[in-house]
């Protein structure tokens, strides 16, 4: 019997062209994203600079304080954007390391040499989309800024702020606790309807989470709970 050889020929030219086009589109997307991130960062710096100049020129102390608060909020948004940019901000974000770097930046920029306040981040891990991570970061930033400003009105020797992030499947809980001045009765505090509270509530609503505040003589804890999250203690009950 004669040996026979069956040859199959496939023209892959079109496939390779499509692959090259896909790679080029991905490259262009990365370049555009990089450019957009730089534009956002530059815009935030410009806005922050304008606010700071306005604050230096006004005569009203109340107006100056409001402008300084606005400047800090713009800079906090810039810090969140910078951390997301540093982490790539394309795929899922590891939340705890992201919050740790963010809070380290906040501590450096907001706590002066005359105040002994430490900021610590603890957690079990957990991943989030870049958009979710951005909102979580902004909430944590707002709550940390609020604690630095209001929880320690005097030069407390051992001021502490602890940011905890727990996960349970798709659900999570973010809490920011301080050991500053709280409420003597230990009841849930009704948060004031200020700009910071409005920002936190709006971001929490976008994430499908609820906000709870508990203040007692030992300090204040604000919790942002997503869906049906249960703490370890409640899961064990």
Which residues fall in each region the model found?
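Short beta-to-alpha transition helix within the HATPase_c
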Residues: 68-75, 79, 92-109
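PAS-family sensory domains
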Residues: 2-11
């Amino acid at each position: 019997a004669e040996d026979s050889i069956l040859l199959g020929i496939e023209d892959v030219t079109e496939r390779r062209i499509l692959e090259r086009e896909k790679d080029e589109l991905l490259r262009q997307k990365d370049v555009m994203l990089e450019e957009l991130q730089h534009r956002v960062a530059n815009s935030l710096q410009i806005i922050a600079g304008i606010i700071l100049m306005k604050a230096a020129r006004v005569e009203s102390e109340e107006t100056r304080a409001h402008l300084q608060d606005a400047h800090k909020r713009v800079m906090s948004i810039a810090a969140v954007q910078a951390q997301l940019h540093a982490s790539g901000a394309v795929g899922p974000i590891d939340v705890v390391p992201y919050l740790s770097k963010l809070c380290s930046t906040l501590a450096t920029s907001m706590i002066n040499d005359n105040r002994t306040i430490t900021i610590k981040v603890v957690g079990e891990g957990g991943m989030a989309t870049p958009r979710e991570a951005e909102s979580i970061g902004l909430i944590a930033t707002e709550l940390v800024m609020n604690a630095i400003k209001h929880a320690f009105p005097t030069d407390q020797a051992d001021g502490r702020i602890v940011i905890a992030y727990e996960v349970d499947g798709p659900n999570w809980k973010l809490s920011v606790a301080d050991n500053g001045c709280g409420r003597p009765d230990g009841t849930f505090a009704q948060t004031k309807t200020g700009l910071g509270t409005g920002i936190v509530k709006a971001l929490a609503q976008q994430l499908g989470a609820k906000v709870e505040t508990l203040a007692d003589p030992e300090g204040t804890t604000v919790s942002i709970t997503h869906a049906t999250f249960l703490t370890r203690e409640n899961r064990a009950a």
